[in-house]
Amino acid sequence: MNKEKVPQNAVPNGRTKLRQVTSATPLDEVFQYWEEDGAIVIKGLLTSAQVEQLNQEMGPILQKVAIGGHASDVRLQNFHGMKTKRAGDLTNNSAVFRDHLLDNDFIHAVSQRCFAYRGKMGPDAYWLGSASTIHVGPGQKPQTLHRDLGSYPIFWMLGPQGPESQINFLVATTDFTEANGATRIIPGSHKWEFNQHGDRDMTIPAEMKAGDCLLISGKVIHGTGGNKTDQERGCLAVTMCANFLAPEEAHPFIVSMGTAKKLPVRSQRCLGFRSQWPQSSPGLWTKDYSELALHLGLDD
């Protein structure tokens, strides 16, 4: 769509700082704040010891990953960040990710409530879209403002009244500051018509301590800030999407069977090692219309 032809008259909701909760906060309160602003900070989702271990586990991977990624499209290169490291394959390489994020009760509670679509899809109607680092290096320019639901065009067509296609848990593995590229949000923009794009002056930084988590709607306008420091800003992005949508990462082709067999059932399901059973569906991701886990021998 040509942005110049559409009057840009949407305004933020006036929030100057995102509200903060913890994993112990009642879900009704979490969802109230999240639905009002499109983003919320969860304090202390990981402990300092877990963050330290996670950074140690990901260190060797980050040393090898290409800065800026491998996309041949210049537009995607700029979007991903020419001075940003995006490394996946976390399930194979990080015990902290496996034990404390992929199998995190709070993340699952939020995802379960979000993707149940008010009970129409059943309790487990989500799986892992992607999990990757977003390590923003010194000198990285601000990312183009965007909505994450762009990966699923049909949801774009449904507009802001449509259900969520995906949500993102951005876990800080270093402190997030305005100077080092804290993710920037336009509060309330998830309620705008999708032909409204906002601008950087409307954004506020989601400043956090390492271990905190920024939960964002797939509809909210956001983008990584520019890093004006000499230190890297560390982040782990954990995306959940509806389980009738293709995930960004091809987890069953990446995660080893040896690793998968050691995981809890809900982690196996989230990674696509088990079938998906949305309410009223005869089953998705099956073998002979039966549970995939039987074919894979996960229940032996």
UniProtKB/Swiss-Prot annotation:
GO BP annotations listed:
fumonisin biosynthetic process
What effect does gene inactivation have here?
Produces only fumonisins B3 and B4.
One GO molecular function term of this record is:
dioxygenase activity
Keyword set includes Kinase: no
Keywords from the named record: Dioxygenase, Iron, Metal-binding, Oxidoreductase
Q: Looking at the record's lineage, which domain of life comes first?
A: Eukaryota
The annotated pathway is: Mycotoxin biosynthesis
Q: What is its EC number?
A: 1.14.11.-
Q: Which parts of the sequence bind Fe cation?
A: H146, D148, H222
Physiological role: Dioxygenase; part of the gene cluster that mediates the biosynthesis of fumonisins B1 (FB1), B2 (FB2), B3 (FB3), and B4 (FB4), which are carcinogenic mycotoxins. The biosynthesis starts with the FUM1-catalyzed carbon chain assembly from one molecule of acetyl-CoA, eight molecules of malonyl-CoA, and two molecules of methionine (in S-adenosyl form).
Q: What is this protein called?
A: Dioxygenase FUM3
